[in-house]
């Protein structure tokens, strides 16, 4: 079954995924003639039952702060004016935590006492790092970073005392997000302010595909993510349109050709493809620009700058038109539109911060979000748990460690806050 499933298979898939609690029993009778809202959302107005799904884990954040990492950074200045500290990105690989603060990359060993492993600085005092991604290839740990310098830097983590490695050159403007393929670690996806997403074989290095042009992204692409099989990716941004691209046979042939090229062969063997028309697109999901998006199996979780997170299922109707089922809506406190607040999720739980130093945890099983969707009562705070760290701290970045027992928050201070994430035992599942 494809990631974008036909409407005739949508209900069966929802039942297979044990998500029938989202819809009433009468959903079996839904057809194309059923009433739909102006936003192409399936409306369900009958009573909804909420049976428990004991197979999905619930989590909670321990209220006491487990620890803090204080960055060893000097106050940066430009033209005698202090530059605001801004942790733009956090990621980890095994026991190494990567923290991007302005134009510096900090590496910490989080296996024991959070000791500083290394630090590097990007070329140019005013060129900030905006995104990171990590992968291990032939027993070498690589970190790639993008930002205001448009090129993508590839770093050998063992040589972090200086900016070594090479660059992927092709984007014409800022790079906002980087994502490695879930299985083929040669493949790197990048999203940019130049209105394109690009697919690279980062080990050659070679640009394989440009996703852009007519009928494609019309403005800055802020966020991307692969599906769990690496057969599709989703992207969105300033134009508020969600687009899904498929790795079709032509693209796969280009990938296979690049895999046969090594660094000793002459360049130019792989011709860069231009892919314009997406497999799926929809502009009815959010009312504001979308700055974070994630695949969750065949479902998509997306967030807009107005503090609204939606979970939805894309599908093709019987006429081949793009449509979607809205599964959940989560709303968290935000007093202003802030670009770049990221969320993360594990199992059935979503964690996000805001500009007031608050952490929100949403558990889809415990909330009655599905009922709110049915009643169109969207704009409520429906979080399962909220923790206050400190007033007026922008918690823009959130990241789980590899073992999903620690969660890291960072923003507009020189400190990263660490909380312990624990599983909640379901008494009915003993």
Predicted segments with their positions:
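Inter-blade linker and blade-boundary elements of WD-repeat/beta-propeller domains
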Residues: 4-25, 53-82, 113-131, 160-177, ...
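Beta-strand-rich domains and repeat architectures in extracellular enzymes and scaffolds
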Residues: 77-104
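Conserved strand-to-loop turn within each blade of WD40 beta-propeller repeats
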Residues: 100-102, 145-149, 190-194, 236-239, ...
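WD40-repeat beta-propellers
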Residues: 105-109, 152-157, 178, 197-202, ...
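Repeat-solenoid scaffold signature
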Residues: 221-244, 275-309
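Loop/turn-rich, solvent-exposed surfaces of beta-rich toroidal or solenoidal domains
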Residues: 307, 329-368
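Blade-level signature of beta-propeller repeat domains, shared across WD40, Kelch, NHL, RCC1
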Residues: 399-430
């Amino acid at each position: 079954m494809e990631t974008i499933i036909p409407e005739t298979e949508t209900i069966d898939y929802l039942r297979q995924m044990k998500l029938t609690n989202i819809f009433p029993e009468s959903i079996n009778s839904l057809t194309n003639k059923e009433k739909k809202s102006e936003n192409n959302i399936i409306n369900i107005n009958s009573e909804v039952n909420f049976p428990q799904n004991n197979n999905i884990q619930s989590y909670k954040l321990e209220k006491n702060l487990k620890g803090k990492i204080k960055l060893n950074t000097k106050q940066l200045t430009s033209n005698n004016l202090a530059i605001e500290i801004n942790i733009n990105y956090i990621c980890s690989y095994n026991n190494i935590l990567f923290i991007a603060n302005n134009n510096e990359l900090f590496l910490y060993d989080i296996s024991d006492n959070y000791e500083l492993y290394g630090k590097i600085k990007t070329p140019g005092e005013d060129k900030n790092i905006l995104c990171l991604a990590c992968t291990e290839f032939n027993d070498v740990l690589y970190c790639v970073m993008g930002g205001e310098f448009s090129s993508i830097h590839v770093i050998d983590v063992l040589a972090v005392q200086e900016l070594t490695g090479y660059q992927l050159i092709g984007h014409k403007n800022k790079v906002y997000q980087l994502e490695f393929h879930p299985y083929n670690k040669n493949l790197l996806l990048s999203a940019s302010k130049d209105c394109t997403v690009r697919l690279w074989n980062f080990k050659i290095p070679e640009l394989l595909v440009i996703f852009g042009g007519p009928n494609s992204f019309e403005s800055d692409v802020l966020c991307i993510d692969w599906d769990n099989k690496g057969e599709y990716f989703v992207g969105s941004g300033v134009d508020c349109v969600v687009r899904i691209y498929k790795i079709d046979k032509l693209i796969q042939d280009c990938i296979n050709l690049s895999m046969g090229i090594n660094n000793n062969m002459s360049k130019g063997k792989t011709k860069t493809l231009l892919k314009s028309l997406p497999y799926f697109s929809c502009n009815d999901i959010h009312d504001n620009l979308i700055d974070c998006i994630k695949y969750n199996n065949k479902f998509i979780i997306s967030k807009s700058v107005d503090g609204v997170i939606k979970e939805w299922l894309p599908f093709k109707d019987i006429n081949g038109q793009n449509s979607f089922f809205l599964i959940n809506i989560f709303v968290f406190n935000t007093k202003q539109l802030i670009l770049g607040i990221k969320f993360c999720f594990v199992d059935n739980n979503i964690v996000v911060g805001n500009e007031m130093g608050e952490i929100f945890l949403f558990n889809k099983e415990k909330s009655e979000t599905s009922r709110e969707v049915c009643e169109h009562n969207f704009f409520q705070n429906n979080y399962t748990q909220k923790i206050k760290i400190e007033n007026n701290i922008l918690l823009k970045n959130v990241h789980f460690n590899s073992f999903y027992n620690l969660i890291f928050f960072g923003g507009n201070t020189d400190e990263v806050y660490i909380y312990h994430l624990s599983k909640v035992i379901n008494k009915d599942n003993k």
